[in-house]
From Swiss-Prot:
InterPro entries: DHS-like_NAD/FAD-binding_dom, NAD-dep_histone_deAcase_SIR2_N, NAD-dep_sirtuin_deacylases, Sirtuin, Sirtuin_cat_small_dom_sf, Ssirtuin_cat_dom
Major enzyme class: transferase
UniProt subunit comment: Homomultimer. Forms a complex with SIR3 and SIR4. Component of the RENT complex, at least composed of SIR2, CDC14 and NET1. The RENT complex interacts with FOB1. Interacts with ESC8. Interacts with and ZDS2. Interacts with MCM10. Interacts with SLX5. Interacts with NSI1.
PROSITE patterns to which the protein is assigned, alphabetical: SIRTUIN
One GO term (biological process): negative regulation of DNA replication
Annotated consequence of substituting R139K: Defects in telomeric silencing
Organism, scientific name: Saccharomyces cerevisiae (strain ATCC 204508 / S288c) (Baker's yeast)
Record's protein name: NAD-dependent histone deacetylase SIR2
Length: 562
């Protein structure tokens, strides 16, 4: 089965642009929905963003992949998001990435469409391999010119379903269906040493019947729809902001800087991050949990709080200390430049550094306070720290008497006792093992984010004039979506140990966060209010440009690239 008229079907549908404005509700939902059939090369599938699909896609006719499915692909790929004055800020943010200006980096036009060839002697197909630069350029081309020209440029006139597969790969995605991948791998050979275009004359250009079943073709078309929608929801890098000097100049002129921080800002203090090879989740694999994240699962906590309190001492933050990076943010506040610091950390070190509560949003809560899960009595978090260090369940004094009745043999505060003592026959079935247990006010999986996050972000994304993401891999939604909420003309800077490949930062400074903060302060002529500043201000830093807008920062203390 060949697909000679697919481009015509897609192009014809693309001519009928969506003229009505996308409603705030539709657009906000679109931002938060996530594709389930494809995963990004650099990001888990549950973190993806996609535009909502029209009903026609949900009931695709699998017996006619050349008819309704082609039209549906064109319909979704050609959707345009147009902001209006009364749109929700979250809706405007997604719509704004579609608009283009002179500040946007213009992509290169490829030399020709994707080439797939077939060896007539053995029937094996030869597919292309793509470089990181080619993938980035393709995504930029789609954003800059739209789906119509993108498909017309990257696909040949006559094509089969394998072209759809390779177009998905070119955009930086991988098909998740293992059965489909197995079929493709059995008929395709990727020559890693030479490009398909350079292979000998024994390889003929593909114009034979489709090697995949109709159902598999439909699956690929759906995946391409999702890939296109994901790309259309992300921003393009700015053409006039890609050097350290650009960053320094912007820091001097910016007045409303939005700072998003993650675990990397605290690792210099000995606090582990969560997802690295040496992070917290790696250290607790020995507990035998199906998923290490279960220690922060709210439902599990309510049924057995000892799961969390067995390891809580490992994430308990040190008191009254903070890093030079925390003080760098405090410096921005002192200069009247800090709009807000959104932190994913639960250690509350920002407050120790002096960042005011009105400038701080603890997206995932913190150890600053604790609350009884039964009567909701609230107290300062430091009052349960000793219990946590001693592997004891912190219990509410107001619920203690009742807990003793429900758990006559296991009412005490030893970790694990409540989960193993006191049978269900001795208490009502609705009384959980967490009765009367104090829980730190950190946001567990299954809990809603604090109201302050939702209230603040709606205003801040429209007011900020610079976004700086520090020490975060941006893998936890909805905080990770902030980079796509901010208007496209606002410069975005990453300061992190490792690159974040699923976001389009204008400038990435890779290295130790404290070092980079000190280097930036030196170049700005500023003083970081931290006890280590006397050493940091005289430190020598080297910046090595790895790619356009990507620099590796090293020092005498940390000479190795990361």
């Amino acid at each position: 089965m060949t697909i000679p008229h697919m481009k015509y079907a897609v192009s014809k549908t693309s001519e009928n642009k969506v003229s009505n404005t996308v409603s705030p509700t539709q657009d906000k939902d679109a931002i938060r929905k996530q594709p389930d059939d494809i995963i990004n090369n650099d990001e888990p599938s549950h973190k993806k963003i996609k535009v909502a699909q029209p009903d026609s896609l949900r009931e695709t006719n699998t017996t006619d992949p050349l008819g309704h499915t082609k039209a549906a692909l064109g319909e979704v790929a050609s959707m345009e998001l147009k902001p209006t004055n009364d749109m929700d800020p979250l809706a405007v943010s997604a719509a704004s990435v579609v608009s283009m200006s002179n500040d946007v980096l213009k992509p290169e036009t490829p030399k020709g469409p994707i080439i797939i060839s077939k060896n007539p002697s053995n029937g094996i197909f030869y597919g292309p391999s793509f470089t990181k630069r080619e993938s980035l350029n393709a995504r930029m081309f789609l954003k800059y010119y739209g789906a119509h020209k993108f498909l017309d440029t990257y696909l040949p006139e006559d094509l089969n379903s394998l072209y759809i597969y390779y177009l998905i790969k070119l955009l930086g995605f991988e098909v998740k269906d293992q059965a489909l991948i197995g079929t493709i791998n059995s008929i395709v050979h990727i020559n890693s040493q030479e490009r398909v275009q350079d292979l000998g004359s024994a390889i003929s250009v593909t114009n034979v019947e489709d090697p995949l079943a109709k159902k598999q073709t439909v699956r690929l078309i759906k995946d391409l729809q999702r890939a296109i929608n994901k790309v259309l929801c992300t921003r393009l890098r700015l053409s006039n902001f890609f050097t350290i000097d650009h960053f320094i100049q912007k820091l001097h002129t910016a007045r409303k800087i939005l700072v998003l921080t993650g675990a990397g800002v605290s690792t210099s203090l000995g606090i582990p991050d969560f997802r690295s090879s040496e992070g917290f989740y790696s250290k607790i694999k020995h507990l035998g949990l199906d998923d290490p994240q279960d220690v922060f699962n709210y439902n599990i906590f309510m049924h057995d709080p000892s799961v969390f309190y067995n390891i809580a001492n490992m994430v308990l933050p040190p008191e009254k200390i903070y890093s030079p990076l925390h003080s760098f943010i405090k410096m921005l506040q002192m200069k009247g430049k800090l709009l807000r610091n959104y932190t994913q950390n639960i250690d509350n070190l920002e407050s120790y550094a002096g960042i005011s509560t009105d400038k701080l949003v603890q997206c995932h809560g913190s150890f600053a306070t604790a609350t009884c899960v039964t009567c909701h009595w609230n107290l300062p978090g430091e009052r349960i720290f000793n219990k946590i260090r001693n592997l004891e369940l912190p219990l509410c004094p107001y619920c203690y008497k009742k807990r003793r009745e429900y758990f006559p043999e296991g009412y005490n505060n030893k970790v694990g006792v409540a989960a193993s003592q006191g049978s269900m026959s001795e208490r009502p079935p609705y009384i959980l093992n967490s009765y009367g247990v104090l829980k730190p006010d950190i946001t567990f999986f299954g809990e809603a984010l604090p109201n302050k996050f939702h209230k603040s972000i709606r205003e801040d994304i429209l007011e900020c004039d610079l976004l700086i993401c520090i020490g975060t891999s941006l893998k936890v939604a909805p905080v990770s979506e902030i980079v796509n909420m901010v208007p496209s003309h606002v410069p975005q800077v990453l300061i992190n140990r490792d690159p974040v490949k699923h976001a389009e930062f204008d400038l990435s400074l890779l290295g130790y966060c404290d070092d980079i903060a000190a280097m930036v302060a030196q170049k700005c002529g500023w003083t970081i209010p931290h006890k280590k500043w006397n050493d940091l201000k005289n430190k020598n830093f080297k910046c090595q440009e790895k790619d356009k807008g990507v620099y590796v920062v090293t020092s005498d203390e940390h000479p190795k690239t990361l």
